[in-house]
Amino acid sequence: MMKNGIALLAIVAVGCSAPNEPTQFNQTIEGTDFTIEMIPVQSPTGNFWISQTEIPWDLYDIFLQFINSPDNLNAGVDAVTGPTPAYGSVDRGYGRNGYPAISMSAQAAESFAGWLSSRTNRTYSIPTMAQWKIANVGGGGAWHQWNSEKSTHPIATTEPNTLGIYDMRGNVGEWVITDDGPKVIGGSFRNPPEALGPETLLTPIKGWNVTDPQLPRSPWWFADADFVGLRLVTIDGDSNE
């Protein structure tokens, strides 16, 4: 009888702890049919949720269209200022539908996070470097210099890592916030596989925009950084609907 009682208590204890664990959720976006799958990540400094994939053009284009629409210029998207049009095709001909958005500056990435926050009931941001590293657990495939055929690839077309997150390494590098300002982490389709991961941390340089013929050069787009993309995080969990 005592053994059965101990077993019953163990079952109850396990059942009671489950509700405290962060769970995955789908982020809907007001005024669109698009959703973002958000993956929970447990951290000693506080749980957070990270987008399962890099942000695709499908959603980034909605942001651009909304920001640049004449009907919304005065609205300002709740004080979010949008990027100016890019010179040339910012997708470089790699692909649009299902492909990661590329070439945006840190300023544009932060503006996108602000816009998404204004369309949801959560605050979104670029990950800190610490958050990115915690989410960069083992496993998962990667698009890199030797298998990418010199192009980005559609999101979620390799194996996810052990948390269920796609393309943390490779495909496109991703903006993170560091003590020294925004940087791009993780490596991209232009790097060899051994260079993918947190060791590849790039500081924006003038060379990323040297062929932009506009003067002044765009603060929103990089004419020569087709390897830059983004994903977002939030600390507002699945119950914050």
Walk through the language-model features, giving the residues of each.
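GGW-centered surface loops in extracellular recognition modules
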Residues: 23-39
